[in-house]
């Protein structure tokens, strides 16, 4: 299963640190501390290349709440941090990363962090700590984090998280007999330290589960867009009528089995329209000019941005090519004023296999 990235443009005529204790939860104190991304049975195309993302979870949007910080390495402050995991041992006792077939990681606030290069990610907030450094049993005044006389003893900050798996080598070199642990801690929110398997009961963790559901295929498909340039042009839009009537244009995704591949197995093609821009909800992308973009499947159901849905199914006896038609719709955002002038928006089409 490999991600193929295609850009669709919509046009319209208008260093390692010591470990210090801190509790972190989802949303509020005592909230959830475990988020699991389940890997379904997925398939990797035979032309998969080293570094390709073969699985990516849905995006998780949430607030992280942290408190109960103990004295940290710097007087008066300790940053809640998210680290890519440092190490996990296989049952055989080998270093987890030495399996050399897959790399695990996390996309944190839009930036990828591979497990092979763990780096601290400092949140833009901190907690004042009693008795840190030279301040005895009190707090530094003014407090470092609050900036005032009263210390800041807890923080809440928003995060966007996706978990992923990459190929560490070309698909045709992957060890097909490899057995992995069922669960992997990819991301942990805590004080300035690395993620790990100990003392995580009060540390919010994001985990990948189902690592042995990965299968290498003997086939792959070529993906094309119609129109071929990937531009969906809405032409000129009347700023008055768009307030009451939506406008639509169609495009298609064409998937064709490579004629040189064996293709003896059954597999499905999943697709996701991906964006890092603002979503009004999972089905509506904010264009930024008072309009919203929505994409529909051929059966009339709306797609959800940044989430995968089935585009096609192939088998040894199926037709060599499948076309998936879509309809892109623009409508007025009821909460904003429509701004006249030319605009465009890029959306990335991600293709994967299972």
Curated annotation (Swiss-Prot):
GO terms for biological process: cell adhesion; response to methylglyoxal. Keywords: Signal. Residues 1-21 form the signal peptide. One of its GO terms (cellular component) is pilus. SUPFAM superfamilies: Bacterial adhesins. Transmembrane segments: none annotated. It comes from the Bacteria. The keyword Transferase does not apply. To E.coli YbgO. May be involved in a fimbrial system chaperoned by YqiH and exported by YqiG. This is Uncharacterized protein YqiI. It comes from Escherichia coli (strain K12).
